[in-house]
Amino acid sequence: MLKIAISGSTGRMGLALINAISKDKDFKLIGGVASESNSNIGKDLGEMAGEKRIDVKLSSKLSDLPEVDVLIDSSEAKFSLQSVEYAKNHNTALLLGTTGYQESDLSNIEEASEFIPLLKAPNTSMGIAYLKKVIDLTSDSLSYFDNLQISEKHHKDKKDLPSGTSLDLANFLSERIVRESPINIESERTGDLAVEHKIILSNDLERIELSHKALDRSIYAKGALIGAKWLKSKPNGLYSMSDIYS
């Protein structure tokens, strides 16, 4: 049984993780953290997420956590750097499901991965990992298309624009397809849309669209747990969700 703690326990992803762990006997939730100002501090994590009581209270300090196998961070970028430092100092595997990092933040993350197994996952959906696999298998011939762009749709409350997933896909494509111009990203924020990311390849004669749509937010929690289980057995290093099926 893998012992898990969550930083950012009260957000959408954090609550989805609590729900998923409560239904999976391979995992045990033994700690959760949120900011000091959070009104849920001191509450039972299970009850907070609408599950049965698990006698694990939400804390405001990473230092309150017991020894864990994997720390999953789904907080904001500025707070997740505390998780990076904590995991590094406590020799704990870390899954970062956070976006919005600055260049200096990425340097800190890469440096920490020399000391711990660290999975950086702006999107923990296995479908996005499979989409990248398709690109890997076909990248040698994709230069046939003159135009390459990414479009994304998110709910109106999504903070980062473009999303971390779109930036990650753009970087992934740029490393595999030689292009002179940058990849354009079109972003839509409205209502409570199902999350969608689309890669569009075209020329004057034809067009291909590779699309991934998240029909339920539980896919991110499920993917994160798959990633956590995989990460625990890995040596120190910086990993992505694509590495799980490489």
Each model region followed by its residue ranges:
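Rossmann-fold NAD(P) dinucleotide-binding segment
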Residues: 62-70, 74, 78-96, 108
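C-terminal substrate-binding/catalytic lobe of Rossmann-fold NAD(P)-dependent oxidoreductases
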Residues: 5-7, 12-65, 142-246
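Structural detector of well-ordered beta-strand residues that form the stable sheet scaffold
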Residues: 30, 57-59, 93-95, 117-119
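Nucleotide donor/acceptor-binding cores
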Residues: 2
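Rossmann-fold NAD(P)-binding glycine/threonine-rich loop
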Residues: 78, 84-85, 98-118, 129
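Short, ordered loop/turn segments at secondary-structure junctions
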Residues: 99-101, 123-124, 153-155
